[in-house]
Amino acid sequence: MMMDPDSAKMQDYSGWSFGFHMPPTSSTNLLPQSMPDDLSNGPDSPDSTGKDGKKNDDRVKRPMNAFMVWSRGQRKKMALENPKMHNSEISKRLGTEWKMLSEQEKRPFIDEAKRLRAIHMKEHPDYKYRPRRKTKSINKKNGAPIPFGNLDTKTPSYPTLTTNWNATNQYIDQFRFAPYPTTTVMDQIPFSLTYPVHSVPTDNSSPSQFQPSPMSTNFAGSYLTPKSESSPVGSDSTVGTVDSSQFRAYYDHTKDQMMYPYSIELTHAQNIQNALSQSHVTS
């Protein structure tokens, strides 16, 4: 029978005494150690047990009261009748039954508790009741543990965001922009101030009748050359030069917003020239 050479090598290696043996780990060679008694239940616990399984005698038990004397036999009876009932439920029912008993029914158990207390005081004259410290239970919310119980678990309140676009615009306009004029404010503004009207000259009107309005910035009709009042439409006399006085009366470059920067520079230049000419004359 033919064998694969690799499998043959593996078989040879497995036969060696030192081949493929894992060293013992820390968990395999550790011997089981018993937990110290002081870490398991503690000396103050009445249910703490020693190495031999016996209860620790260093802890002096508290003497039983009348209810404990009565419930000692009733607990066993109820546990036998209800084997699946939890111990806390048994204690709750026993407490309810104890409250329903009369003083005559409780009297023998009260006397027995007094007798046990007297014996306890004789055996342990320096006894002092030391209740066990209860560990603070961690606050839980919705089943999830909270690491710090003193933290405020209230939900922080945030301002609700509105989806109304008009309300958002009012909030923005309050800090950045002036409010838009309403229709009542717009109605009070004259129509000539909001929409300047320019009248185009006709053949039967004089150029002096068409002065630009003070608020007018539109100069589309300002450069139209007026025609002669006496010349008919389409005659040859319409072509010619226009008197400069009529043109100045019709068009004033100082009122033109586009020409205003140039007119200021021209005025400064004329003033400088006049000042220079006067200085030459005086000299």
Swiss-Prot record:
A GO cellular component entry from the record: nucleus
Ranges annotated as biased composition (Basic and acidic residues): 49-61
Listed InterPro entries: HMG_box_dom (IPR009071), HMG_box_dom_sf (IPR036910), SRY-related_HMG-box_TF-like (IPR050140)
Stretches with biased composition (Low complexity): 205-216
Gene Ontology molecular function: DNA-binding transcription activator activity, RNA polymerase II-specific; RNA polymerase II cis-regulatory region sequence-specific DNA binding; RNA polymerase II transcription regulatory region sequence-specific DNA binding
Sorted UniProt keywords: Differentiation, DNA-binding, Nucleus, Transcription, Transcription regulation
Role this protein plays: Probable transcription factor that regulates the lineage progression of embryonic blast cells and controls the postmitotic specification and differentiation of neurons. Cooperates with additional factors to direct the differentiation of the olfactory neurons, functioning with the transcription factor ceh-36 to specify AWC neurons and with the LIM homeodomain factor lim-4 to suppress AWC terminal differentiation and promote AWB neuron differentiation. Plays a role in the terminal differentiation of glutamatergic and cholinergic neurons.
Subunit comment: Interacts with egl-27 and ceh-6. Interacts with ceh-36 and lim-4. Interacts with wdr-5.1.
Record-given protein name: Transcription factor sox-2
Taxonomic source organism: Caenorhabditis elegans
